[in-house]
C-alpha cells in the first residue's frame, strides 16, 4: 500500500492523492524519492506561488502585453506560442524565436491588451526589433488588427511574497532549469544567504545550478508539476542516497539536520519525460552531497588564451585587454531565464510536441495477463494511462509491463534500443538497465508497438480505448493496418479496442472550445455520417482520426461555401467540371481512392487548386480521410488559406452527393 508523504505536523503540504504521488510504475515519483533520500520538502509557505495552482485557459496565438525580459522597462505585444501546465511560452511580436520566454499565468509581468495605455504608458518595440523603428506604429496596428486578444478573465492576480526567507539547506523543491527553461527538475536548497537561495539540481553537476531570491517565480513546491500537468524531469541517473539514521517523523521541522552516508545507490526512476542523453549540453551526473548540503566551492577557472606566437616582422603590437574573471559565486539573483544561450527552438517545446496526438489507453485487469506478467501486480496498476502525449503514454504502458513481470529481464529482452524516445528501466542481474524507446512519430507506430509487445507477452487483451467489461474485445492486428492508419498532425486520438467501438470518441480528448456544438460521447451522431459517405464500420480506422474533432457541420456552412464558390469560381473550372467524365476516377467509390487518386481529384476539381495537391501526399490523405475533411481542418492542419479551403470543401460536398 502506498502512503502519501507528509513531513510537517503543522504544515500541510500539497494534498496529492496517492495515485499521483506514488505509483507502481517505474517513473519518478516524489513520494518514493523523498523516502529513499530521507529528504524534507520545502513547505508551501516558502514560495511565492498560489496555494491552489491557477488554471491555464490561454490558447495558442492569443495576444497579450508582456515585459521584455531583456529590457524590463519596456512593455511589448507578445503572442502565446506554447502552453505547459500553468506556464505560457511567449514570443514578442517583432522578435524571433531565439528569444522566447516562459511566464506563469498569474505573473504580474503579463497583462491584457490595453492595460499599458490605460495606465498612461506606450507599447514599445522589443529589443532587437527586426524592422525599422519608424515602422513600429504601423507594425503594431497590423499586428493587433483582427488578432485574438486574451480576455481579462483568464489573467490571475500574482500571489503575495512570503514575509521572509523560510528556506533551509537540504529542502527539496521543483525548479526551472534556466538554461533550458522548458524543463522543471527536482532540486535541493544548497545554501541560504540572506534573501537568496542556491538551487542545485539533483543528480547533475553544478553547471546548471543558480542563485535566486526566495520569492522567485522559477521555484515551486514539491508536487507542483503533478497538480498543474507540467512535465517534471527525473533526477540524474547516478544519485547516491543519503541515509538518515533517524525516522522521518523524528526530523526537526525547524532546523532539518539529516545525517547521511553514501553507500546505497538509488535505482534510477525515469520520469514521464525521461531525460534524453545529450539533451542538456554539458550536464553530467553528480553525486548527491549528504545533508545538510554545504555550499559548493566554485573556484574560478583560469582563463585560457591561445598559444603565444611572436609578432610578424613589421607588425605593431596591440595591447591585449584581459577579460575580468567571472565571480566565484554570484551575489545577486538572475532576474530572467537566460534563453539567449539556448540554440534556436531549443528553449521551447518542439512544434511537433505542441500538436502531438493525445492518447488514452485503459488497462484490462480482468483478462489473461499471460505467462510473463504477475496478475497481482497488474491489479495494482492504474486503470488507464493518459490522456497524454503518445510518447508519454507509450512509456507508461511499456514500463508497467516491465514492473509487473515475473522476470523483468524477459520483458526487457523483447525491446530494442531506440533513439529520441522516452526512457524505460528494468532491474535484473543485480544491475539497473535503461533503454530508450524509439521516437513516436505517429499514432500508427504506437498502436503497432503495443500490439507487438502484447503479442510477445501473450496477453493480447491487455490494453484498450474504453474501460474494460467482459464484452470488450482485444486490440487486433487488423486495427493497426498501415494502409488505413494515416493521421493528420495535431489530432486527438484514443486507442481503439474493437472495430465495433472504434467510432466512439473519447470525451476527455476533445477540443470543447473549437467544437462546442459537435461534442458527443457516443457514436450515434457519427453513424449517419458514415452511411452518407459510404463507409462500412469495418473501415472505421480513418474515421477515428477525425471524428474526435466533430462531425460535418450543418447546412449553414454548406450554403456559405456555395455562395463563396459562385463568387470565386476560377476561369476554366467549368471546363473541368464538364470533361471529368473521362477521368479514371469516375465510377469509383471515393472511399477506395488512394492518395494519388485524391491528388488527381484536387487537380481536376480546379486548376488553381493544383499547387495544393502535394499537401495531400504530405499528410497521406486517402479517399476515406478526404470525405471527412472540413474547411477548418484544412486550414488548421494543412496550412491552407480560407479561399482554397472553401473551394475544396465545396468540391468534397459535391463528391458526397455523387455529382463528381
From Swiss-Prot:
Using the UniProt annotation, give all residue ranges assigned to the region (Disordered).
233-345
Task: Cite the entry's keywords alphabetically.
Answer: Developmental protein, Nucleus, Repeat, Repressor, Transcription, Transcription regulation
SAM domain location: 593-658
- Record-level GO cellular component terms: nucleoplasm; nucleus
Known role? Associates with Polycomb group (PcG) multiprotein complexes; the complex class is required to maintain the transcriptionally repressive state of some genes.
Q: Name one Pfam family in it.
A: SAM_1
Gene name linked to the record: SCMH1
Q: Where are the MBT repeats?
A: 28-126, 134-235
Q: Which PROSITE patterns match?
A: MBT, SAM_DOMAIN
Q: Where in the cell is it found?
A: Nucleus
Q: Which domain of life is it from?
A: Eukaryota
Q: PANTHER family under this entry?
A: POLYCOMB GROUP PROTEIN, POLYCOMB PROTEIN SCMH1
Where composition is biased (Low complexity), the residues are 330-343
Where primarily located? Answer: nucleus
**Composition bias type Basic residues, residue spans:** 273-284, 305-320
From the UniProt record, give one GO term of the biological process aspect.
heterochromatin formation
Q: Where expressed (tissue)?
A: Strongly expressed in heart, muscle and pancreas. Weakly expressed in brain, placenta, lung, liver and kidney.
Q: What is the recorded name of this protein?
A: Polycomb protein SCMH1
Family of this protein: Belongs to the SCM family.
> Molecular function terms in GO for this entry?
chromatin binding; histone binding
The entry describes its oligomerization and partners as:
Interacts with the SAM domain of PHC1 via its SAM domain in vitro. Associates with a PRC1-like complex.
Amino acid at each position: 500500500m502506498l502512503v502519501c508523504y507528509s513531513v510537517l505536523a503543522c504544515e500541510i503540504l500539497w494534498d496529492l492523492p496517492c495515485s499521483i504521488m506514488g505509483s507502481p510504475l517505474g517513473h519518478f515519483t516524489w513520494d518514493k524519492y523523498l523516502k529513499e533520500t530521507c529528504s524534507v520538502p520545502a513547505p508551501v509557505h516558502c514560495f511565492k506561488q498560489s496555494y491552489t495552482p491557477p488554471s491555464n485557459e490561454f490558447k495558442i496565438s492569443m495576444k497579450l502585453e508582456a515585459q521584455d525580459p531583456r529590457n524590463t522597462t519596456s512593455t511589448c505585444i507578445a503572442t502565446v506560442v506554447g502552453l505547459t501546465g500553468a506556464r505560457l511560452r511567449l514570443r514578442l511580436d517583432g522578435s524571433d524565436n531565439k528569444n522566447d520566454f516562459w511566464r506563469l499565468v498569474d505573473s504580474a509581468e503579463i497583462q491584457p491588451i490595453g492595460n499599458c495605455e490605460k495606465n498612461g504608458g506606450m507599447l514599445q518595440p522589443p529589443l532587437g526589433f527586426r524592422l525599422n523603428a519608424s515602422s513600429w506604429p504601423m507594425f503594431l496596428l497590423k499586428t493587433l488588427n483582427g488578432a485574438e486578444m486574451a480576455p481579462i478573465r483568464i489573467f490571475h492576480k500574482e500571489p503575495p511574497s512570503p514575509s521572509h526567507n523560510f528556506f533551509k539547506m537540504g529542502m527539496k523543491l521543483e525548479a526551472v532549469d534556466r538554461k533550458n527553461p522548458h524543463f522543471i527538475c527536482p532540486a535541493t536548497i544548497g545554501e541560504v544567504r540572506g534573501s537568496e537561495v542556491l538551487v542545485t539540481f539533483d543528480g547533475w553537476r553544478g553547471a546548471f545550478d543558480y542563485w535566486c531570491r526566495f520569492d522567485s517565480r522559477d521555484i515551486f513546491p514539491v508536487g507542483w508539476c503533478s497538480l498543474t500537468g507540467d512535465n517534471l524531469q527525473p533526477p540524474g541517473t547516478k544519485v547516491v542516497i543519503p541515509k538518515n539514521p533517524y525516522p522521518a517523523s523524528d526530523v526537526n521541522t525547524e532546523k532539518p539536520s539529516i545525517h547521511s552516508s553514501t553507500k546505497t545507490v538509488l535505482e534510477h526512476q525515469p520520469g514521464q519525460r525521461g531525460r534524453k542523453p545529450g539533451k542538456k549540453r554539458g550536464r553530467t551526473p553528480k553525486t548527491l552531497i549528504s545533508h545538510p548540503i554545504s555550499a559548493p566551492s566554485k573556484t574560478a577557472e583560469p582563463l585560457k588564451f591561445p598559444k603565444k606566437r611572436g609578432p610578424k616582422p613589421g607588425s605593431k603590437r596591440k595591447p591585449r585587454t584581459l577579460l575580468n574573471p567571472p565571480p566565484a559565486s554570484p551575489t545577486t539573483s538572475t532576474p530572467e531565464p537566460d534563453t539567449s544561450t539556448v540554440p534556436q527552438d531549443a528553449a521551447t517545446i518542439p512544434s511537433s510536441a505542441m500538436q502531438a496526438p493525445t492518447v488514452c489507453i485503459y488497462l484490462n485487469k480482468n483478462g489473461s495477463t499471460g505467462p510473463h506478467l504477475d496478475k497481482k501486480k497488474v491489479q495494482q496498476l492504474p486503470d488507464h494511462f493518459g490522456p497524454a502525449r503518445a510518447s508519454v503514454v507509450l512509456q507508461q504502458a511499456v514500463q508497467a509491463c516491465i514492473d509487473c513481470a515475473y522476470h523483468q529481464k524477459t520483458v526487457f529482452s523483447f525491446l530494442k534500443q531506440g533513439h529520441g524516445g522516452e526512457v524505460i528501466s528494468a532491474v535484473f542481474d543485480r544491475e539497473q538497465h535503461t533503454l530508450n524507446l524509439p521516437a513516436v512519430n505517429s499514432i500508427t507506430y504506437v498502436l503497432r508497438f503495443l500490439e507487438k509487445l502484447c503479442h510477445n507477452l501473450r496477453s493480447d487483451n491487455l490494453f484498450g480505448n474504453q474501460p474494460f467489461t467482459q464484452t470488450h474485445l482485444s486490440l487486433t492486428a487488423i486495427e493497426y493496418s498501415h494502409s488505413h492508419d494515416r493521421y493528420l498532425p495535431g489530432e486527438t486520438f484514443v486507442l481503439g479496442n474493437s472495430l465495433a467501438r472504434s467510432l466512439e470518441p473519447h470525451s476527455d480528448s476533445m477540443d470543447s472550445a473549437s467544437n462546442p456544438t459537435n461534442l458527443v460521447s457516443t457514436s450515434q451522431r457519427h453513424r449517419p455520417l458514415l452511411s452518407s459517405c459510404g463507409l462500412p464500420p469495418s473501415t472505421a480506422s480513418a474515421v477515428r482520426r477525425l471524428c474526435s474533432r466533430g462531425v460535418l457541420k450543418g447546412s449553414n456552412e454548406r450554403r456559405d461555401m456555395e455562395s463563396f464558390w459562385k463568387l470565386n469560381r476560377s476561369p476554366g473550372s467549368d471546363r473541368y467540371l464538364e470533361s471529368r467524365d473521362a477521368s479514371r476516377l469516375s465510377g469509383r467509390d471515393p472511399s477506395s481512392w488512394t492518395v494519388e487518386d485524391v491528388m488527381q481529384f484536387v487537380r481536376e476539381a480546379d486548376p488553381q487548386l493544383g499547387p495544393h495537391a502535394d499537401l495531400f501526399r504530405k499528410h497521406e490523405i486517402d479517399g476515406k480521410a478526404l470525405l471527412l475533411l472540413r474547411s477548418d481542418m484544412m486550414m488548421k492542419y494543412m496550412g491552407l488559406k480560407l479561399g482554397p479551403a472553401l473551394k475544396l470543401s465545396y468540391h468534397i460536398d459535391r463528391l458526397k452527393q455523387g455529382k463528381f
